[in-house]
Amino acid sequence: EQGTGKLSNIKAIEAGGNTTYAITNNGEVYSWGYNTYGQIGIGNTTTQLKPVKTSLESIKQISANQYHAVALTENGEVYVSGYNAEGELGIGNNQNSVEKWQKMRNPSNTDDMKNVKQVATGRYHTMVLTNDEKVYATGYNNTKQLADGTTTTRNLLKPMKDSTDKEITNVKTIEAAGYSSYIITNNNELYSAGYNNYGQQFQNNTTDVAKLTKIKTEIGIERIAATKMQDKQTAAYIDKLGRIYTVGYNGNGELGNTLIGSSNIPYSISDSKIVADEPLVNISQGTTNSINPKYSTGFTLINNEIKINLKYESLDTNIATVSGNKIAGVGIGTTHIKISDETNKIYGSVKVNVNVQGGIAQPKVVGGENHFVALKSDGTVWTWGYNGNGQ
């Protein structure tokens, strides 16, 4: 705010490697911090210790990474500044640095890039999502993050492709970080490409991914995030139930799974399950009882209303049967009722003890190989025969 030394009326912020950006409510941009490559966009390479107003106007989003920044206007144009030796600014050349904001070019280099609705920056590459739901990328590609099937670095935008070599379409949102690229489609499928040394591509391996490849998940994905590190990278996604899955580098506990050790297999750190009012049900033989399970969200980030479609299964129908949520004791002993919701991939169980009806057991005699066991009507057990193993 003028004269106070404080910024106000800010609607969005962004952090690069060592640089900060703030967008005001009217679309102006202030930036400050490390500026060796001109990533602040004020016409010089002097590091700024206080916010400086830039020439940008009508800005709705800024994405910044280690040494470059990309700004998106309300009308879908893209401005870039900073490091460009790998072509990440998409201006048709590899000029080492750009100190003033200038417009990104279209893939054919015949005009400025237009009709963009989201931008994302990795360490040395940039992704853009257009209004027609297609994705383009430019910049460093040695680890295949441009998803064009090559390792050729580009200085102009190029369409990103899926594993069938088709240009990816129907895209809802994009994310870039380090040497990785991620997209989520309108039907909540997650695709990834790029460097995969710690399994950060969610593919259950550590092989680099050359084209956007679908990630196998049980239900739809809502959001994706990854650390900005190009090497020791950790990634996470949130599914439609709000459950969080993490993968990748874990040298300092980044995965949140209570372990120290990296993993290329996604792990849920959300304790989502089906729980019953009573985890242990005691019933008598010949009687019934009801169980009333509920969905326990555990640690989640999205509080969506969940429609549960439960299925019940007795693991030993000689002891107890189940119909809907009603358990019937048919034998004597202990079993479990498995509760599942295959739509949302959540599960639970209830332990069931079936006791003697009215204290009167049904007499029964059973035989082993060399010994016998008898259950008397008073509920006592008698044994006889070979006892070499304490049977």
Regions found by a protein language model. Give the residues of each.
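Extracytoplasmic soluble-region selector
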Residues: 271-362
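Short glycine/serine- and acidic-residue-enriched loop/turn motifs that recur at repeat junctions
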Residues: 1-3, 30-50, 79-104, 136-158, ...
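Short coil/turn segments at the loop-to-beta-strand junctions that recur within blades
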Residues: 46, 57-59, 96, 108-110, ...
